[in-house]
Every structure is written in structure tokens, then in C-alpha cells.
């Protein structure tokens, strides 16, 4: 006789309906969402999620970072829980699925267990981490970072948004300051299901990404100092052009990333010119280089080479150059046993799959410091994310949720 839940699927329609219902909260201007952390919309989304969880029989705990832990009890009171987590907060111009898919698929896994009358030895905890995005309060993955001991609670509370409001004050204001000590919970395992946020799965026509690693990164902030001058009347050989120096550094970063394949990336997404006038050569340019690799030695080698070559480029142009490392985390290797559990679930269910390295940071990257951890990914249309046009299909969402359901059941141990 088949074991409870054997080859069963989650309720795809219920999952999709929940995603669409959550997306009504904090609507964006172009079909996505603006539900930034600790806003009124975030509070409303949390309350909706809480109500769904309580309807499913889960009990809630909230820690001093506002992270929500919704627990389905296991049969063994001494067994550590299996966590399923992600985030409900979004970018200012975010999509409906980034983070939200993982949280609501965790809830759907529990709902399906209830439907099938499944009991597990280990408790199941569905987790909504606070401020994963870092869009309003930098840095990203803040609550999971405090949980893992990367940041202090005091540091987190002192983070300020662009309006000068502090994380701690806003956490109190929306009513989600809990009393549970951050990091007090111990985990048997941690699973996170997420959209890929890249184009590989769709291009390869695969339904499931089995995530083996998270890339490490360095963020290097450059300040280049040139001389403001008229773009029309300053001869080419008499310019001290900070903008030209930046362009040559960007080309060098591209070369360094290409020479450190496979897996390395590098680029610039933020830059500021001063005085930023169309007919004035910039006297100052500030920009941030983002380099990533799943290989620690390559990552550190890329940083060293960029920091060595950039000043030489600037010196040849007479431009001043200073570099500050403003962000970093090491590459993460996910738990091999859990990775194989995910792969086995995909194979059992007949879903096409491939290994992936996550190019983006996730709460799972910090969870891996304190518990066996892995991730599951599904495709997203065109690889778009952090964009209101972010989209997935109902079938993609359900396939990953099915794999999550079976991988969690195997790890939490069904009691017959």
C-alpha cells in the first residue's frame, strides 16, 4: 500500500488563488506590487497570511525582528522543526511572486498535509522573514542575518529608510515587534522555494532548479575625482574626465568576470555623476561594482584584480580613485543530503530538473549558517524579477510546490 502522500500533488488552484489574493495588497503601478517592509501594506499582508495559517491550524510566534513563525506540531515533542521560509515584502516596483511564492507554498504544503491526514514526526514551521529585500532598510536579508548572528539586533533597529525612519520604530508602529529572542529557534532543516530570477530554467525548458550553491559577492564603491569643465570648449588632451575613467573600469570589470567563468558575474547597477549636467565633464563619479561567484578563491581574486587595476586606469587619466568595500557575503554550499532529497522528489514526480547556482542572495544563505539548508527554484518568464512584469505560470508554481511538499515530508518523516 502506498504511503500517505505518495505521488500526491498540492492543490495548484488553491495556491494560485492565494498568490493572487496576496497580490491585491500593496498594488504597484504596472501590475506588480509595492509592499515594502514595515509599511502599512506589509502589515496588511502579514495579517492575511496569519489568518490563513490559523485557519490551517498553525500557531504563531513572532520574534524581535518581526519574523513570523507558524507551526504545525509534530508527533515527537523533542524533534526539531523543519522550516519552510521566504518573505512577503517586495521591491518598490516588485512582482507578485518573488519571496511570496515560497511563503505561500509552505502554507500550501501544510494545507495539503491536512487534506491528506498526514502526520509528521518533526514539526513544520512556515516562516516569513522580515526585510529580505532591503529596498527600504539596507542591508537585504536583515532579519535572517540577525537570526544567524551576522548582524546584531541593535544594528538592525538603527537602520534608516530614505525618510530617516528607523527599522525599530517602524517595526513597533505596524504592530509586529514580537517578544521571542532572535535566533532562539533551532532547526532540523530549512527549505526555501523561490522563482529563479534569471533566464536559465526557461531557456533550458526545465521545470525545477535544484539549487546547490548561492554565489558570494563583493560590492565595491568607487569614488572617482576629476575636474569639472565645459564639454564643448575643453580640448580632449586637457581633460581630467572621471566619466571616461568609470567607463574604462566598467570594461575592465566585464573582462575580469568573463575570465573567471564558469559562474562569475560582474557589473554596475548604480552610479552618480556630479554635477550631472549635459555640458559639464563630471568632477566626481560614484558607482558600485557588484561581483559574484560561487567559488571563494575566484571571488576574492576578482576583487583583488579590480582593486589593483582600477587605480592604474585612473592614474593614466589623471583621475583620483578611492575604493571601499560596502557589502560582502561568502559563497554558500547547500546541504548535500537535502539537495539530493529535492532532486529525488523531482525525479519521483516526473519533473524535469537541473542544478542551479543562485545568483541572488536569499534568506537561505544566512539560514545555512545555522541549519542544514537547501533551495528549490521554478522558472520565471524571460528571467525577469525585481520588475512589475515578473511572471510565472500556474503550472511552474505548482511543480515547485509539489517538490517542496515531498522533500519536506521526507525530511520531517511521515508517521503512519
UniProtKB/Swiss-Prot annotation:
Domain of life: Bacteria
Binding annotation for a divalent metal cation 1: 87, 98, 194
Site positions per UniProt: Necessary for dimerization: 239
Coiled coil: none
Region (Involved in dimerization): 213-331
InterPro entries reported in the protein's UniProt record: Amidase_Cbmase, Bact_exopeptidase_dim_dom, Peptidase_M20, Peptidase_M20_dimer
Influence of pH: Optimum pH is 8.
Catalytic activity: an N-carbamoyl-L-alpha-amino acid + H2O + 2 H(+) = an L-alpha-amino acid + NH4(+) + CO2; N-carbamoyl-L-methionine + H2O + 2 H(+) = L-methionine + NH4(+) + CO2; N-acetyl-L-methionine + H2O = L-methionine + acetate; N(alpha)-formyl-L-methionine + H2O = formate + L-methionine
Cofactor: Mn(2+); Ni(2+); Co(2+); Fe(2+)
Thermal activity profile: Optimum temperature is 60 degrees Celsius. Shows a low thermostability, retaining only 20% activity after incubation at 50 degrees Celsius for 30 minutes.
Residue sites binding a divalent metal cation 2 per the record: 98, 133, 386
Record comment: activity regulation: Strongly inhibited by Hg(2+), Cu(2+), Zn(2+), Pb(2+) and Fe(3+) ions, and slightly inhibited by Na(+) and K(+) ions. Beta-mercaptoethanol and 5,5'-dithiobis-(2-nitrobenzoic acid)(DTNB) cause 34% and 42% inhibition, respectively.
Cofactor notes: Requires divalent metal cations for activity. Ni(2+), Mn(2+), Co(2+) and Fe(2+) are the most efficient in vitro. Binds 2 divalent metal cations per subunit.
Record-listed E.C. numbers: 3.5.1.87
Practical application: Could be used as a biocatalyst in the 'hydantoinase process', which allows the total conversion of D,L-5-monosubstituted hydantoins into optically pure D- or L-amino acids.
Family: Belongs to the peptidase M20 family.
Subunit description: Homodimer.
Protein name per the record: N-carbamoyl-L-amino-acid amidohydrolase
